[in-house]
Amino acid sequence: MELFSRNVAAFWIILLEFLLGSVAEEEVLMNTKTETSDLKWTTHSRSKPEWEEVSGLDEENNSVRTYQICQADGSSSHWLRSKLIERRGASQVYVELFFTMVECSSRNTHHRSCKETFNLYYYQSDTDDATATHPAWMENPYTKVDTVAADFLLRKGGEKKVNVKTLRLGPLSKRGFYLAFQAQGACMALLSVRVFFKKCPALTRSLSVFPETVPRSLVQEAVGQCVANAAQPGPSPRPPKMFCGEDGQWVDQPTTTCTCLPGFEASHGELECRACPVGLFKMGSGTGPCSVCPENSQTGETGSAACVCRSGFYRALSDSADTPCTRPPSSPRSPVPQVNDTSLTLEWSEPLDSGGRSDLSYSVECRMCSTPGSPCTLCSDGVNYRPSQTGIQGRRVSIWGLRPHTTYSFTVMALNGVSAQSQQGPAGETINITTSPNVPVLVSGLRKSTATESSLTLYWNTPTQSHYRILQYQIRYCEKERGSEENSCHYMESNNNEVVLSDLRRATQYEVQVRARTFAGYGSFGKAILFRTLPDEDDSSSPLLVTGILIAMGMLLLIIVIGAAIYCIRKQNNYKDPELSDKNGQYLMGQGVKVYIDPFTYEDPNEAVREFAKEIDVSCVKIEEVIGAGEFGEVCRGRLRIPGKKENYVAIKTLKGGYTDKQRRDFLAEASIMGQFQHPNIIHLEGIITASCPVMILTEFMENGALDSFLRLNDGQFTPIQLVGMLRGIASGMKYLSEMSYVHRDLAARNILVNSNLVCKVSDFGLSRFLQENSSDPTYTSSLGGKIPIRWTAPEAIAFRKFTCASDVWSYGIVMWEVMSFGERPYWDMSNQDVINAIEQDYRLPPPPDCPTYLHQLMLDCWQKERTARPRFANIVSALDKLIRNPASLKITAQEGAGPSHPLLDQRSPLTPSSCGTVGDWLRAIKMERYEETFLQAGYTSMQLVTHINTEDLLRLGITLAGHQKKILSSIEALGIQNKAPGNVLY
């Protein structure tokens, strides 16, 4: 009921405010009704009678001063002039006249000279200088307002009615004015004269207050201000504005951005900002209402912008003020240990109370209890945890590296996002276990005694072992740079706590571990320690090193001098040498071969942006709609209209707010890269906008968007020859990039854009990607934070970060597979780690459904493990051109298509000639059946003749792809039956 009453009251307040704001206010300048003494206006007449001032009664029987005149002859003018009336800033005023007029037919006078009208004039003046003769009693210098006619006339025996007329004067510009009345043959009485002007009253609307405003023109702009507890957003906002009409009424709605401050809500129809009551809050500025405090929070006063958490409840630093307060979780339940010698698997159940949060994690604290009765101490660094000791997401942890026959106390603690805010420690559940006495203890204290160029002498502490005598030590050492590959690790045994590792590589780092063996068997390896062999055999070689350094420095100085001389000579003759020129930092090698310039090689990366990208004025760009979002910000469609050029659509990448200087440089680096490329299959850079916020990159607009989603939307709608045409365009663009020595690093169908003519263009030239290590699902991460799945990346790029044009060729093979499968995800739902393992074991993607055999073989060529065996992009473009000229070859397809349940192709052990009876069988076994007719026409009709083939023979047969050459020669060489050693594969 109370809420209903408040709403009704608010309605009437709003209605009253609206009505008051829409009614004009009148300010009276003169009113003869209110005068209590004689008016003493000036009269002028050349003949009798004159205007006569008399006292009379108005309609309410109040005594008023009036003027009257009744002329018998209308040939002369009779004037009546008021005193000076101050205009008080008004540019136009209104004159309200109350008068009576006698009908001519009721008078005993000549009808032709009798009139039933009179004239109204005014005269402006800055001083009150009017006299009996000045200004002259004539129409000029007076300004005529109107000839006033009576609506009601007095006649004998008739009803007495008063005429009321309101006339407008203006425009007025001087200090004041005089009113003048001219009667010519009229019989009338001027009962009252009221002079006033209209003004817009003070108004409150849309949380803005506007002052009383006098209109000085057709519309007068009024500047207001926000109501109390309201403000406008932004550093320098424009004040509220509204227009006052000449009729004294406000025109339309105000132009304002006033909103209530945090802790206040709009009330009474946006007439005021009212403080939020206790128990309610409003966290930001705006016209929205106050909200009830989130769960477990409260306010202690009115006008609160945030609710304070109740005792025992907290908010994480990342939580916003409108989220509920939460508390730390209760302890994990029922920890269950599984002890295996000196290792432990610990599992537990989740807490009964998660604290109201979903970011639950666990930590494990380990304490070793050496002797009964003494306090337990924290475990040493030799204890290992999987997946980790802290931040565990699951409810299971494996622990190893424990000492045998030792009691440990493990505490499993539950934490969430507000555990750090709590003054109490995390709740935990403790369990005690004792390890087996039969396992040797860990070996510790491994250190180096001496080191040479090819050996390391190491020793370690003898473990304290009371149960079994240590029989032997085993040493495991691996080259650090080669990781834990089986062929890089070696083992040695030692009967004492010292060992000499010999036959080591010079200046190489080794990772060494030691474990002990007793009658109970081997224990666990101790902590891995790194040691490095020396670069020289002994210290006596130091003089040779110094001599070598001096020689190298001398040669370097000589090279610098020669280079400077060559530079000066070429600079003098530069106009004569068309083969080598330098323009805008892009070096032309030979005849028109442009080389890509890395923008990060500039001392100031902004210089590269200015050099390769054109700055566009923001007024030339109109953003129409948001079409996507990326790691940098939003992607929009817009129009670009440059004076003198045709308007066209563009794609606009914007940099999201809150960026760092490095993120801005990385964002604009893509523009300085794109600006160097001019090719029909490379996305074209229109320009950049850096002079205003947000920073933008403008490129040509591609109507069909990304290739992968476009293919999925049009699954099965394109013929093989159309798909080959798309692939040919992508390969042509990549050929152009490779010729400029640019490595893309992220070639995938999602980064290929398609226009309305199905032309495919390579895009996304972001840089600075690095590999996230120590992850079960490794991904490349760009500098702006976006993750790139590695299933498009060549194995050498994953393992050694070796990005080359050959690694781009591998990625192109994956793009081919995406195109022929109409946007299928490569390797389907396999994890990234499974993909890495499969590729390392020489498994490859099978052909997509209805994929031409020739195209799948080209994919396999791109996926050669040895990067030097992969075709170049020039070879790929040539091969696809042949397919387009001979579309019949596209009709030969694989027997079965790929799918999530289809196994990967095993490329590890191709069939050898010995298992095949004919040349055709052998070629089909190694997936080279396309060359069967070529072999037979050249006379290779038996396997005996095939075994004599070498590289030169393959070239004569027209087999030029390096991958095909290697596969054929490797199959022959595998049996050791080749009489002539094959030549090197030609690249």
Swiss-Prot record:
Residues 326-335 have a biased composition (Pro residues). The lineage of its organism: Eukaryota, Metazoa, Chordata, Craniata, Vertebrata. Residues 319-340 are annotated as: Disordered. Pfam families: EphA2_TM, Ephrin_lbd, fn3, PK_Tyr_Ser-Thr, SAM_1. Residues 570-987 are cytoplasmic. Its main location: membrane. Belongs to the protein kinase superfamily. Tyr protein kinase family. Ephrin receptor subfamily. It comes from Danio rerio (Zebrafish). GO terms for cellular component: plasma membrane; receptor complex. Residues 914-978 form the SAM domain. This is Ephrin type-B receptor 4a.
